[in-house]
Regions:
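C-terminal GPI-anchoring signal of eukaryotic secretory precursors
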Residues: 669-683
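Residues at secondary-structure transition points
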Residues: 13-14, 147, 676-678
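Beta-strand-rich N-terminal accessory domains
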Residues: 21-111, 119
Length: 697
């Protein structure tokens, strides 16, 4: 909570055009700012300044220095007009605090306000609070463990906004978007904290403060943009064009079309040559396709050695293993992390003596991670450290026959804090993630990372953080969809969903395993089917033949629609449009669409409505604007959106999905490869018969 000595100048920022100003002023004072009114006042608590406009968007700005002298009666203030024909502008100066407000007047159909507040005072905290508003839905913000959609009810208690393990904030782009067509974008170089619905109920507050995990800077700065457009889609497209880098290409197409098979959830750390061979053979014996088999934790001699344990109990002939897997048609990928544990003495000593570890301002290099209480992490902002790390990986690829890598961790929070990193101090600490992803992307578009900061341009998969094996919004199945939507809105459309069924952790213990139920496993795969890739670890044949048949069918359906997924990815490359947008993307002024958190789109041509509620065999489906063909049962009935379909039958075998009519006609006129296979039709026929039996009984 704020201490009583703090003062809070407040800015209510709304639309405004033009200005009339003086220079030195005595408070209170009001001046014209376009068609708005800019008012400054003071009291014993400090300085307040307000802009009011008709549409009512409210942003409260605050500057706290602890011991304030701003309210002294003899204080002089300078208010200066800096407008041009295309931009309204006002500058306000008091002591070392400089506030600049600008508004773009070049387009009457939209408006963009740009606010910069700077102060060189030590210990200053600058803030801005957006009133979320009754009846207004908000989207965006960070990846989170409790991932809501929309996000206005999320709670954040004055937390540093950077990539971190805590709360699963692996994506931390400073961007929010409202259903009213408003976006908020904060300069990512800000020493940023957020507070939502905690200190100020009903508000999203952003702050700049130079305290841990941020290094001390010469000044404190809060810079942000607020764009106002006719609807959220138009606003998002403008924000992407202005602030987000577009990918340069699409990721590996085989990873898109065919599943990744990982040893992690099923076997945890208990992997060896025998288990990997058995796993591969099971995949083939059950008729499943594959892009690659990923050997996860624990294959090293010690954590950080990047050297296979070649004991008889582990991997006595790793090259022989990978050669055999290649002969079976598998590519082989390897789990890699950026840590070296202290007890991995040979490699730890080399890295320590060469200065390859990230350190804090006191020179401390120790950190902890989930497989090491005493460890250090490679500094990916250090070019020599990157060269040492990546050259060892390249040598490992050649000697062990490894095709690509799954890179874990990479969030800035793994470095000792506040970290001393190479590069612009204003970009620290998240510059660690920026350099981590870029260094490892040099291994090609078949890699995966799990974190991102200003790295939307990379042609690689970004994996969701580990999901829990549950039906709840506590990191369970429903958050597979909401996380997908949040990542897409942040510009990361090449999403690798976490493993089908979750990770099976018991009470958060990494080496324990509780299998998902049959129902949860099947519903998870169905929800995943039209996402960019499928990742298995738990397997369908651990259940029964019905599960195998259902899962094989949806795995094949995913591959059949891989060209559509790639089309959507190419649209992201060209235009920055999401690969998997929210439903409102096609109906951006329809308030009913804003709260749909259990449906998603593939591009603009497929609507997916999976069942994510335990025990449910029907669901209500919202179809946005457009003409839709019901592809679920192969009947291709036509629906005109926007409309609701209530109590749509969706027994366990069924994933409801709809194809945009003109796209369906294109598919029908082609090879028909995207239409339901005979096995899928058989499953749906069986499902219909089962429903009829239930009805008549």
């Amino acid at each position: 909570m704020w201490v009583s000595s703090m003062w809070w100048p407040v800015l209510f920022l709304c639309a405004a055009f033009g200005a009339v100003f003086g220079n030195e002023v005595t408070l209170p004072v009001s001046v014209k700012f376009g068609d708005g009114l800019l008012s400054f006042s003071k009291n014993t608590n400090g300085l307040f300044y307000t802009i009011n406009e008709q549409d009512g968007l409210t942003v409260e700005n605050s500057i706290s220095t602890g011991e304030s002298n701003v309210a002294r009666n003899n204080q002089e203030y300078t208010l200066t007009e800096c407008s041009t024909n295309e931009e309204a502008c006002v500058e306000f100066i008091i002591n070392d605090v400089n506030v600049i407000l600008k508004k773009d007047l070049s387009n009457r159909a939209s408006s963009v306000s740009h606010v910069v507040v700077n102060s060189s005072t030590d210990g200053v905290r600058i803030g801005a609070c957006v009133e979320l508003g009754d009846g207004v839905d908000w989207f965006g913000g960070p990846e989170a463990k409790y991932q809501l959609w929309p996000v206005q009810d999320a709670q954040w208690n004055y937390t540093a906004y950077y990539t971190k393990e805590d709360d699963a904030v692996a994506i931390a782009e400073p961007y929010w978007l409202s259903s009213q067509g408003t976006y908020l974008y904060v300069n990512p170089a800000t020493s940023m904290f957020i507070d939502q619905n905690y200190l100020n109920e009903g508000s999203l507050c952003i702050y700049a403060e130079n305290v841990t995990p941020y290094r001390e800077r010469n000044y404190t700065s809060l810079e942000y943009w607020i764009g106002r457009y006719e609807d959220p889609r138009t606003a998002h497209e403008a924000a992407v064009e202005e602030f987000f880098a577009k990918p340069t290409d699409v990721p590996d197409e085989r990873m898109i079309a065919q599943p990744v098979w990982s040893t992690w959830a099923r076997y945890k750390i208990y992997v060896n040559d025998t288990i990997v061979r058995q796993y591969a053979q099971e995949i083939l014996d059950n008729g499943f396709n594959h892009s690659q088999l990923e050997i996860d934790d624990f294959w090293e001699t010690c954590y950080g050695s990047l050297t296979f344990n070649t004991s008889d109990e582990k991997f006595p002939d790793i090259k022989g293993l990978t050669d055999d897997l290649h002969d079976l048609g598998f590519r082989v990928t390897l789990w890699v992390h950026p840590f070296i544990n202290v007890d991995c003495t040979e490699y730890y000593s080399i890295a320590e003596s060469a200065g390859y570890f990230a350190k804090d301002v006191n020179g401390t290099i120790l950190t902890t991670w989930w497989q090491g209480e005493n460890a250090s992490v490679i500094d990916f902002t250090n070019e020599a450290a990157v060269e040492w790390f990546t050259s060892r990986l390249t040598a490992l690829q050649a000697s062990a026959g490894i095709d690509s890598f799954k890179f874990d961790a990479g969030e800035a929070s793994w470095a000792p804090e506040p970290a001393v990193l190479t590069g612009n101090v204003e970009e620290s600490p998240s510059i660690y993630t920026y350099q981590f992803a870029r260094a490892l992307a040099t291994f090609g578009n078949g890699i995966e990372v799990r974190t991102g900061w200003q790295t939307q341009d990379l042609a690689i998969f970004v994996r969701m953080l580990d999901k829990d094996t549950s039906w709840t919004f506590e990191n369970g199945l429903p958050t597979l969809i909401t996380t997908l939507l949040v990542m897409n809105l942040a510009g990361y459309g090449f999403v690798l969903p976490d493993m089908v069924g979750g990770n099976g952790y018991i009470d958060g213990v990494l080496v324990s395993t509780q299998y998902p139920s049959k129902e949860l496993f099947i519903r998870w795969l169905q929800a995943n089917t039209f996402m960019p890739s499928i990742q298995y670890s738990f397997v369908p044949w651990d259940y029964d033949n019905e599960t195998v048949e259902i899962c094989r069918t949806y795995t094949e359906l995913h591959e059949a629609y891989a060209p559509t997924i790639i089309e959507a990815m190419n649209a992201l490359v060209a235009n920055g449009t999401p690969v998997n947008p929210p439903v409102w993307w096609l109906d951006p002024t329809n308030s009913e669409a804003y709260n749909i958190s259990d449906e998603y789109l593939l591009g603009e041509v497929i609507l997916v409505a999976p069942v994510v509620v335990e025990g449910a065999v029907t669901r209500d489906i919202f179809l946005p604007n457009g003409t839709w063909r019901d592809a679920t049962y192969g009947t291709y009935d036509i629906y005109e959106g926007p409309t609701w379909i209530y109590d749509y039958p969706a027994p366990l075998e069924v994933l409801p999905y709809f194809v945009e009519s003109s796209y369906w006609e294109t598919l029908s006129a082609g090879s028909g490869a995207f239409l339901p296979s005979s096995s899928l039709t058989a499953i749906y026929t069986s499902a219909i018969l089962a429903l009829l039996i239930q009805l008549f009984n």
